[in-house]
Structures are given as structure tokens and as C-alpha cells.
Amino acid sequence: FLKKIDESELIEINNSIKNIYQDILISENIEDNVKSSILKYLLRLIESIDQYAITGSEAIIEVLENTVGHMYFNHEYKEFMSNTETGKNLLSKMGEVAKKVTCFTGILELANKGFELIENIKDFNN
């Protein structure tokens, strides 16, 4: 299910993620704890792209999963990613990256459905 990415696509993806990183780093409109989480995941993504020749797509997928999965554990992070233009753009970019490295589509849609299911289970148990 993993695809091989050519060098030009890797460079394009990496530059795009680095630009997002810089934009978030200088932003004054993001809470420090949320900014810290986002920057941490973006650095991991940049590193996994840099090491693609060694690790392949698997490391990139792992970072994407962790980035989206963190939304379940941190409410402020989830709110930022779900309800701000910057967060939505970041999720969209991560979806683009996921499509380039896998044959799967709709990873973010599946993640959102998973979050809804988890919330429904939590509500049901309360």
C-alpha cells in the first residue's frame, strides 16, 4: 500500500512543510502549548522526509498518524486543528502528503470518523 516517491516530489513536500513550520513558528495567534505540539510534529515530519531514502514511506506515515492522533489526547490542539484556518490548512497538507506516500485516500476523513466514534462511545458510557 506504500508508494515510492520520486526525488522532486520529496523536495516539494519538504519545502512545503518547512514553509508551514516557519509560518507557525512566527505566528503570535497560536497558544504556546498548541504551537509546541504542532512544531514538534512538523519537525518529525521534516526529519522523516529527509530520511526517506533510509526508512521509506513508513516513517512519514507514522508521523502523520501521530499528528492526527494527538487530536484525541489534547483538546486545545484538536480545536486548533479543526476550527482554525491554519489548522485546517495543515490537516489538508498532511492529507496531500498521505496521498503521495500511500495508495490510501481519505486518511483524514477516516480519522475524523474515528474521533466521532470515540466521542459517541465516551458519551454512551457516561
What is each stretch, according to the model?
Residues 2-81:
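Membrane-active, amphipathic/fusogenic segments and juxtamembrane/transmembrane anchors
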Residues 74-126:
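Membrane-inserting effector segments that mediate pore formation, membrane fusion
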